[in-house]
């Protein structure tokens, strides 16, 4: 890894991340997200895997979303149907002040596992 990363995201952290640039109907702008990847992955690659936190109440697949309520200003739903890998430095990843609770994180990871095992 060539760039020095001051903050190394930990799995389950809630972070702020820049989703720009984006194309089509992809999420745009700076949004909260939950970290899916382990910190060792970030140390090795400089990348972080995340699922966005959204307020997308009109999404037809919302029943698969996982509710997020915090005492540090992040609320909405984790969309486990979307997962992205981004550069920690280029996407200006910042710790949001807490983690996703264990049961909600388990639901997100279970949905990911189910999605990746569809064939």
Task: For each feature predicted by the language model, list its residue ranges.
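C-terminal terminal-subdomain/extension
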Residues: 7, 70-119
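Short, charged beta-turn/beta-strand-edge "cap" motif at the junction between a beta-strand
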Residues: 20-24
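Compact nucleic-acid interaction/catalytic patches
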Residues: 27-30, 34-70
């Amino acid at each position: 890894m060539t760039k020095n990363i001051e903050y190394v995201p930990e799995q389950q952290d809630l972070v702020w991340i820049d989703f720009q640039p984006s194309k089509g109907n992809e999420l745009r702008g700076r949004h909260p997200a939950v970290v899916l990847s382990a910190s060792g992955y970030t140390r090795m690659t400089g990348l972080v895997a995340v699922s966005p936190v959204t307020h997308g109440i009109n999404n037809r697949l919302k029943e698969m979303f996982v509710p997020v309520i915090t005492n540090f200003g992040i609320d909405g739903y984790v969309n486990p149907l979307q997962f992205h890998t981004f550069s920690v430095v280029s996407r200006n990843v910042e710790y949001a002040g807490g983690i996703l609770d264990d049961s909600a994180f388990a639901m997100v990871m279970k949905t990911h596992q189910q999605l990746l095992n569809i064939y």
